[in-house]
């Protein structure tokens, strides 16, 4: 930890409370963010981490906008929410599928993404769907809902960038940055969804955030 802190990160994202205690004992001034892998999805969880002097909580991706708004309006701690990127077929940070199938822990950043593979669906020993992407969620995209996300009280938008190509990160971040700036400048903004689709995606959904339940997986 000591050598890493020489970089002077603006904040560290963690899940392990034991690591949190170690970091705070040695580096009391560093800002700590609780990861989405902690599966924080209610006011009680947020208030608990606030009492532990966590600076920001990244909420679980399975929450909807009304639940998030209630938390933001009843808790003083900064709230961060995933607004764009891959979704997990399980609860974020709680999936054991990769560990069991590929012997790679998704909860340690080594997910083999077996949910992205094709599977067949059987009913009464009869194949009703053959080699379809039944467990592969579409990518979360909430660019059209930026005003509602801001009005909910969210302090930080989280955009997936790990292991993504520079053109993907650049295009997506640029689009959300523009949408946010237009909101605060009180200008009308129509996002160019077609432009965003030019970078890698699995099709777009508004996910659990806006209860887009019928448009979550690719081949359902």
Regions found by a protein language model. Give the residues of each.
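Short, small-residue-biased leader/transition segments that mark boundaries at the very start
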Residues: 1-7
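N-terminal cofactor/phosphate-binding cores enriched in small/glycine residues
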Residues: 3, 14-18, 22-23, 30
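Short active-site oxyanion
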Residues: 8-12, 55-57
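Conserved N-terminal glycine/acidic-rich loop preference
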Residues: 11-13, 45-46
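Short beta-strand segments at enzyme active-site cores
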Residues: 13-14, 158
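Short acidic loop-to-helix transition motifs that present clustered carboxylates
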Residues: 18-20, 39-42, 62-66, 141
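Surface-exposed amphipathic alpha-helical tracts and adjacent flexible/coil segments at the periphery
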Residues: 26, 30-33, 47-220
């Amino acid at each position: 930890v000591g050598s890493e802190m020489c970089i002077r990160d603006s904040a560290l994202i963690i899940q392990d409370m034991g690591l949190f205690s170690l970091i705070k004992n040695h580096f009391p001034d560093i800002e700590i963010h609780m990861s989405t892998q902690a599966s924080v999805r209610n006011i009680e969880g947020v208030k608990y981490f606030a009492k532990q002097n966590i600076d920001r909580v990244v909420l679980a991706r399975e929450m909807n906008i009304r639940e998030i708004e209630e938390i933001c309006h009843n808790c003083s701690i900064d709230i961060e929410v995933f607004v764009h990127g891959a979704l997990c077929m399980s609860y974020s940070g709680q999936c054991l599928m990769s560990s069991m199938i590929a012997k790679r822990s998704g909860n340690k950043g080594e997910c083999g993404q077996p949910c992205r593979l094709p599977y067949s669906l059987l009913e009464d020993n009869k194949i009703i769907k053959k080699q379809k992407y039944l467990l592969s969620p579409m990518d979360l995209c909430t660019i059209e809902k930026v005003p509602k996300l801001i009005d909910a009280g969210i302090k930080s938008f989280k955009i997936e960038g790990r292991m993504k190509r520079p053109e993907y990160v650049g295009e997506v971040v640029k689009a959300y940055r523009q949408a946010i700036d237009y909101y605060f400048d009180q200008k009308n903004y129509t996002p160019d969804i077609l432009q965003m689709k030019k970078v890698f995606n699995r099709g777009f959904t508004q996910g659990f955030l806006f209860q887009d339940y019928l448009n979550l997986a690719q081949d359902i």
